[in-house]
Each structure stands twice: as C-alpha cells, then as structure tokens.
Amino acid sequence: LTRLAAHRPIRRQPLAGDPDVRSWAWNAQILFEAGEPAAANEILRRAELYPCEFMPMIQTQILAKYQDRLDADVAEKAETYVRDMLPRAASERIHPSMYNDNFGNMALYVLLVAGSRFGLPEYADLGRIRLEELCDQFRRCGTVMEYGSPTYSPINLYVLAEIANHAPDAEIREKALRCEERLWVEAVTHYHAESGRMAGPYSRAYYIDTVGHAHLAVQRGAELVAQVGEEGGLR
C-alpha cells in the first residue's frame, strides 16, 4: 500500500462526512465518454482511494476502457490501487453465493479483467473458477441472492455485461452473457410497466424504493427493460 504514498494513502475506511468518491469515479467515466479527458483525469487524480467493493471494479474499468486517455500519474495510481486490491477480491469471504452477490460479481470482474491485464494467472484462474461457481448458482437456483432487487439487480446486470465486454477470451464472455441473460429474465418478470420500475417482492431494497422514489440504478435498469420490451428480445 505504501506505493500509493506519492498520490494519496489508502485508508482502511472512509471517514464520516467524506465525499462519495465512487460517484466521482463514475462521473469521470461519463466525462471520458463526453470527450472531456482533462476533467476526468483531474477528478481521478483528486479522488482518495480506500478499500471497498466498488472502487476496484471502477478503476479496472477505467484502465480497460480509457487507458489511452489517462494521464501517466492517474494510470499509475489506478493500476497500483487495483493490484493492491486483488487479494481482497480473491478473499474466500467474497464469492458468488454470498448474500451480497453484487460484491462477489464485482470481485469476479476484477479477478478476470485485472488478473489477465496484469499477467497474474493466480487471480485470472481464480476468476474462472468463481465464474463457473456463478454459472452453477444459476443452474441450481435459477437466480442469485439479490433477485428482484430494484438496486442490485441492475448492478449485477451491469457487472456481467462488463465482464462480457472486457473478458480476455470467448469462453468467459459466453458464460457471462448466459448469466446476464438469465438476470434479464428475472428483471423482465419483475418489471411493472405502469410505474416504469421493478415491482416487489424485493429480495433487497431500501426505504427510497418503497415510497415511490426510484434509485438511479432502478431508473437505468427500468429504461433498459423498457427498450428490451419494445425490441422484442433480450439481446
């Protein structure tokens, strides 16, 4: 972890009142897509990194998608952080059948994509094992623990789609697509057209989801489901 000292030290946990740097990094991706790499790099340069389940995937995505637009110091910061977080992604406590399976799926993305990118077969191979465990979860149960969740179903869909986009070989991409398709079936069967969102019962939800105010993730997922319905197919 000391390798990040030239940038910002990794804290064990954010402090109360700290900004949500996950949102900073998500916004940076939007800026890259909008053709504003200078602003995106400055956000990433200032974002303080700490151990969590979301940021390792976000930083891996940024390296996979925007490497040619990253300033050298920002790229080094991201790579160092992801390398340091790989053991966390490989922890036995993080796996496809855990209750917070969005954590397991984000770790799966990091293992597969970062492990391959950095030439670390011990992590890439573990990612393959974990992906097969996820496939087995679908074969045995038909869905994941966070089924029908207005917050986490869209996150799980997004992660699996990104594995299919950035995975190093065709077999991994095909397995990820099959898992993604099964989750789309889950989303469609919970979609309530009149309200434009997923309907209960929810496996995991927040108060905001129960009083008629959709999460941003819900809105994103509902819009995609609506498009799928109009086009008449899952893909």
Give the location of each predicted region.
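Mature N-terminal, pre-catalytic/accessory segment of carbohydrate-active enzymes
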Residues: 1-18
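Generic surface-pattern signal
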Residues: 6-9, 87, 91-94, 136-139, ...
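Aromatic-lined, polymer-binding surfaces characteristic
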Residues: 16-167
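Extended polysaccharide-engagement surfaces of secreted carbohydrate-active enzymes
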Residues: 168-235
